[in-house]
């Protein structure tokens, strides 16, 4: 880790140069790389936000680790780390825009005065689809003109041209104090906890945010027992217990909901625990495994009302 920090290189592989680094690499990391076949040149991540901690660990093992961004409608690549060469990658971004593609940020689609440089990502280029098959209405919603596609994703371009994606424009919500919250990256952060299987952060038009969590029951019960917390009863009883909820919320506040990933107003003050896994079978997930937020909020309507007071 010190070797990588000293090199000042993000995402790219940093070969060991000093004696003890080489020795440790031979004794430990070489064996880890061998478990993956021994021939991996680099790792790519897409579809969801890549945790910087995960990326840095993969880099420490000895692989370059790059995050990219694209959509089916853009065939698919829009931006990526790694393609521009060594030293041209940046953590917490999806990299530089690909050759032949142009990205603009429509700030009119987003009205948070504290984040005025963010907006909807608009993709321009020959890679943009002509339209959705036999669905002119859906096509007209996203195709501004031929070769120009409205993604629905919230984005920001920094001064060096690196693109970052805080979330979806439509998934953002505003708190009572006027602050906007982008839940997607925060939910991914929560799912790094071994105690959490699925998580949703909400709080639209409320004073504070709250969580709905489907916990890893076995991991949570074991951790609670170690902490001296009673775990008797069924999974439903444990999840309904205020003691359990207070304990898990405290754990997540201490280990996940921390700066710089979380701003103070984003930190949840309440939690609802759902003992049942969200799936397509109970209509809580789409076929592409995205949470059906409306269904989930409706299912927990009574508990949400208690939080609202």
Language-model features and meaning:
Residues 1-38, 217-259, 275:
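Alpha-helical "lid/cap" subdomains adjacent to substrate-binding clefts that gate access
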Residues 1-89, 102, 109, 197:
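Gly/Ser/Thr-rich phosphate-binding loop
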Residues 91-97, 143-146:
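Short Gly/Pro-enriched turn/cap motifs at secondary-structure boundaries
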Residues 106, 152-154, 159, 193-219, ...:
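C-terminal boundary motif of the adenylate-forming
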Residues 110-116, 120-175:
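Conserved ATP-binding/catalytic segment of the ANL
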Residues 117, 204-229, 258-274:
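Conserved loop-to-beta-strand segment in the C-terminal subdomain of adenylate-forming
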Residues 128, 162-191, 220-242, 262-266, ...:
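Adenylate-forming
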Residues 173, 198-202, 249, 253-309:
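Conserved C-terminal "lid"/linker of ANL adenylate-forming enzymes
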């Amino acid at each position: 880790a010190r070797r990588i920090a000293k090199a000042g290189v993000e995402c790219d592989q940093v070969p060991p140069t000093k004696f003890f680094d080489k020795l440790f690499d031979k004794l430990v990391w070489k064996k880890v790389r061998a478990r993956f076949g021994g021939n991996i040149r680099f790792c790519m991540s897409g579809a969801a936000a890549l945790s910087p901690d995960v990326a840095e660990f993969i880099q420490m093992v000895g692989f370059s680790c790059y995050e990219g961004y694209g959509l089916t409608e853009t065939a698919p690549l829009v931006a990526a780390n790694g393609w521009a060469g060594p030293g041209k990658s940046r953590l917490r971004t999806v990299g530089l825009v690909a050759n032949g593609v142009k990205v603009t940020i429509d700030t009119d689609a987003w009205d948070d005065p504290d984040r005025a440089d963010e907006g909807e990502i608009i993709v321009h280029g020959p890679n943009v689809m002509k339209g959705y098959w036999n669905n002119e209405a859906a096509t007209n919603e996203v195709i501004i003109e031929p070769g120009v596609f409205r993604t629905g994703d919230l984005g920001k371009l920094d001064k060096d041209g690196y693109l970052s994606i805080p979330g979806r424009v439509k998934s953002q919500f505003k708190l009572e104090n006027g602050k906007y919250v982008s839940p997607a990256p925060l939910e991914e952060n929560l799912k790094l906890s071994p105690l959490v299987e699925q998580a949703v952060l909400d709080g639209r038009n409320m004073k504070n945010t709250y969580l709905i969590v489907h916990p890893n029951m076995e991991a949570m019960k074991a951790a609670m027992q170690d902490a001296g917390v009673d775990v008797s009863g069924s999974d439903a009883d444990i999840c309904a217990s205020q003691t359990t909820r207070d304990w898990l919320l405290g754990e997540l506040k201490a280990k996940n909901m921390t700066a710089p990933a979380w701003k103070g107003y984003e930190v949840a003050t309440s939690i609802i625990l759902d003992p049942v896994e969200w799936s397509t079978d109970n209509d809580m997930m789409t076929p592409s495994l995205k949470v059906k937020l409306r269904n989930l909020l409706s299912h927990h309507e009574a508990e949400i009302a208690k939080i609202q007071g």
